[in-house]
Amino acid sequence: MLGGRTNHWGRISLRFGPKDFKSKDYDGLGENWPISYDDIKPYYNKLDKLIGVFGTKENIFNEPDGFFLPPPKPRLHELFYIKGARKSGVTVIPSRLSILTKRINNTRGVCFYCGQCDRSCSAYADFSSSSCYVIPSLKGGMVDLYTNSMVVEVKTDNNGKAT
């Protein structure tokens, strides 16, 4: 299937926070990563801009903010959840999903809330590798696509470039 798992991942676009990279320092369990959140933050920022992620800046320590498009307005049932959660003292924030609520380029459309995200988006408002990388690459004429195939080896030259 063109796009593979990026067709089925639900578009959930959360960042690991500082604690996730250094969990041993916080709870004594597992091992710390050899990198920190600050090391990877520039790549998260680049990815947010590339794929388009909606959300809101919340300043929650281990749920880092990113570059967000505006989230959709809450639906009626979500307003009930929010009201109940706030009454109970539970923090509620909008999802952080890679679905375009605002145009970021000329190849992908904007979500019109049809509710068919699980079946692939006809407006290309959701991120998938096929709609955002493969199809545009094919239009450039420098890529060959082999379906029903599996890569077992990528050969590289002395500079590490695929040959």
Where are these regions (language model features)?
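Conserved beta-strand-loop-beta-strand element in the redox core of flavoprotein oxidoreductases
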Residues: 150-163
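Conserved redox-cofactor binding core of oxidoreductases
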Residues: 12, 24-148
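Conserved phosphate/anionic-ligand binding catalytic regions in large, soluble enzymes, centered on
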Residues: 1-11
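Short, ordered coil/turn segments that flank beta-strands lining enzyme active or ligand-binding pockets
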Residues: 2, 141, 158
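Short clusters of hydrophobic/aromatic residues that line enzyme substrate/ligand-binding pockets
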Residues: 2, 21, 111
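Cytochrome P450 core scaffold surrounding the K-helix E-X-X-R motif
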Residues: 17-25
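Flexible loop/turn segments at secondary-structure boundaries
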Residues: 16, 100-103, 152-155
